[in-house]
Amino acid sequence: MHKQTRDHFNKFLHRVAELNHVADATQKFNVEPSVEQKLLEKIRETSPFLTLINHITVDQQEGEKVYIGVNSTIAGRTDTSGNAERQTRDVKTLSNDKYRCEQTNFDTHIRYNTLDSWRHRPEFQSLLRLATSKQIARDRLMIGFNGTSVAADTNRTTNPKLQDVNIGWLQQLRAHKASAVMSGKKIGNLNDKDYPNIDAAVYDAAHELIEPWYHDDELIVIAGRKLLTDKYLHLIGDNDKPTERRALESLMVSQLFGGLKTIAVPFFPEDAFMITPLSNLSIYTQAGSTRLYYLDNPKKDRIEEYRSMNECYVIEDYDACCLVEGIK
């Protein structure tokens, strides 16, 4: 490590220790609440999708969901001229489903030569933080859309999409409301298909699988980029004019499926789509669970950051969403 780089890194460690009221950042410590919130905000800001959903800090590792759903409509009328009385309705969905935040490790390293290349940059400390924040955001998306289990010892080789790190949103829906999940549907113009096109599939799923009191403007289709590409690629290919191609490419970003706004999100399964209000998806982090430890490892010519936090992926109300997967 270059002498100037060493000086920058030591200042970084000193600042981390100062903010967290510890003597030494190279000894494992619990992150201060205010710093913890800033770290979580930095992660969220690096991903457009993560800025659209809920990020909630909870006190307990396990407990009741924070938001409440509704289990029916509430508008009505009662003729009280006789013996009948007006009756209130409980708007809270009664559910035994609880959240549980699992410890997740985000351990990274940066080699000395990379740090040396940053030594003349005034934002040296910000670069150190940003490198980790970006990858944590990517991992959260990958877990949210692909996670199916919580393994004591995760295996990145057999689970390249982090399927064994935590239980993601799609798996939560499969486990807790299987009736809101369709699979194996065929889409196309041939006679043996279930739907003539993706629009028909989305329209049917929204009206058949989601409770009617959630049929409002907040419903969004979350899809893999392949579904969007399959629908509009032939249009782009048929247009050689740059202006027309740009217009069509822009259309793919904000297009409607079945009359609903649609967004393509990285790491979402290519053969699936989910319909839900974005406010129905949450990531819970247990307050005070973030721990940090920095190690200067000359044996490997790198610095290492060991970060962990307790987190979970929550669907607030299963009645407000559905999943169509395994599309053929």
Which residue ranges define each predicted feature?
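Signature of extracytoplasmic/envelope-associated structural regions
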Residues: 3, 7, 18, 52, ...
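Short glycine-rich, low-complexity/disordered patches
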Residues: 22-35, 142-154, 215-222, 245-248
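Hydrophobic, Leu/Ile/Phe/Ala-enriched alpha-helical segments that form helix-helix packing faces
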Residues: 16, 136, 140, 205-213
